[in-house]
Regions:
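Short, compositionally biased
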Residues: 45-172, 221, 231-243
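Intrinsically disordered, low-complexity segments enriched in Ser/Pro/Gly/Ala and basic residues
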Residues: 6, 37-40, 92-93, 105, ...
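Short hydrophobic beta-strand that contains or immediately precedes a catalytic carboxylate
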Residues: 76, 179-180
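Secondary-structure capping and domain/repeat boundary segments
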Residues: 1-48
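Short, charged low-complexity linear motifs
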Residues: 1-7, 84-85, 187-193
Length: 243
């Protein structure tokens, strides 16, 4: 293909030329052979330069629509963010410091729903999850408070709610932390985990509900697969914030 120009962009690392936008399609190098004389469009691939954010975590995403959405960056809590106590079996903390909790009450459809999966939906998902569990007793007064009487709602629930733990986090003095949505969690896998910016060696909950019994989670052990799983199962969590 011959000599290719290099490009620069503030806050990003240039990662080559590709046949599709945003680093999709096929990478084109100086050794690539094309046949034919027609012009071809090439697209630069950019990798966001992760840096330490105002809350002491890792900023891993820049929102291209920040003027409309009202937030520009996503910041993940740092390793060791959780300072709570593990129970006698240690189920609330993993070897890297990320705690394990249930997603929430199993068998109940949240209203408003928390089915948002896209980038930018984690905050509203989290607020809806917290409000639902905080007020569940009002819908079922005979069962009482969910956090103290979880088995009244489902005999497999233990009263922990992943989104509530994230919302209660006050890292860096900020109170706007939330449980990431399905797509926000995948960004953390692609940008932070695969590039060794932080320690993620577990299965992680997202804030994206699937149905009354299941929510989306992601495997950070290797391939990064996402799937729905029972909400009464315990998985690791890592809060993020938008600013």
């Amino acid at each position: 293909y011959g000599e290719l120009a290099r490009s620069t962009r503030d806050g990003y690392t240039f990662a080559g030329w590709w046949t599709g936008e945003n680093g999709t399609g096929t990478e084109i190098t100086e050794a690539t052979v094309f046949t034919g004389a027609s012009d071809r469009s090439l697209y630069a691939k950019w990798i966001f330069d992760v840096y330490t954010g105002p809350a002491g975590g890792l900023v891993f995403y820049e929102n291209p629509n920040w003027k409309v959405d009202g937030w520009k960056y996503l910041e993940a809590a740092p390793d060791g963010w959780y300072d709570g106590d593990a129970d006698s079996d240690g189920v609330y903390s993993s070897e890297d410091g990320d705690p394990f909790f249930q997603w929430g009450a199993s068998g109940y459809v949240l209203n408003p729903s928390t089915t948002g999966t896209g980038i930018g939906t984690g905050s509203s998902n989290t607020a809806n999850i917290v409000n639902f569990h905080d007020t569940l007793w009002a819908q079922y007064p005979e069962k009482g408070d969910y956090y103290t009487n979880p088995t009244e709602y489902n005999n497999k629930n233990d009263g922990t709610v992943a989104a509530t733990v994230c919302a209660d986090y006050r890292g860096g003095g900020y109170s706007d932390w939330f449980l990431p949505s399905k797509d926000e969690l995948n960004l953390m896998f692609q940008i932070l985990h695969l590039n060794n910016f932080s320690t993620f060696e577990s299965f992680y909950w997202s804030s994206s509900e699937d149905d009354a019994d299941d929510a989306w989670m992601q495997n950070f052990y290797g391939e990064g697969s996402q799937r729905v799983f029972w909400r009464d199962f315990t998985f690791a969590i890592r809060p993020i914030r938008a600013f």
